[in-house]
């Protein structure tokens, strides 16, 4: 597998050959807190003068190495080329017209400039707090709790009808996301605005390992019985955390509605 130094040299040399105006990198490789491993992508942008000329003949992409798989994506005025190479490295390369550089900057939480002789990035600053969580207001908390318990009824319906994809989608995509949000707010109460990462990937760094194990145990959706078990455990987890959060902040928690919704689920699924 090519080293980071080799890959960055290749990225910069290719940019030089193509007469790219500026090069920057975003993603986990620009975050000192991110764990270092072989799965970190090279999220790179080439700021270019002539986008149409570059995409007219993409043979130059071969210079990055032999690809296992690739994907091309159109993003507003930009072109994104996702490439996984045989040696395990991956480059997510964005081609961005110079006049639309702000479009790329606004799409990224943080970035590091690798080459910018014209100073094109000078007017722009990274916004690393994009995935940070601030302390919740009482309205935020109330809306989150209402969303959790309301959508839990959809999960009950899906399980009862044996519509398992529907049930799982609402359980993980809504209820468990509200649980993760609540856990992030728990941290923010003590620490202020905190970096939980995209998709909460750093959240459990702020908790004892048992908390992550408790959440991970919810993620078996392989059959109807296990989805049902996950729903009840998710309800218990959320109810426990919401009460603790309410006690800590003084925010009102509608415990009566929560317990009625748990009874509703028990009556229909037990």
Predicted features along the sequence, with ranges:
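Surface-exposed loop/turn and secondary-structure junction residues enriched for glycine/proline
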Residues: 42, 64, 114-117, 186-188, ...
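Metal-dependent nucleotidyltransferase catalytic core
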Residues: 1-21, 26-39, 44-94, 99-101
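Residue-level preference for alpha-helix termini and adjacent loops
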Residues: 38, 110-113, 202
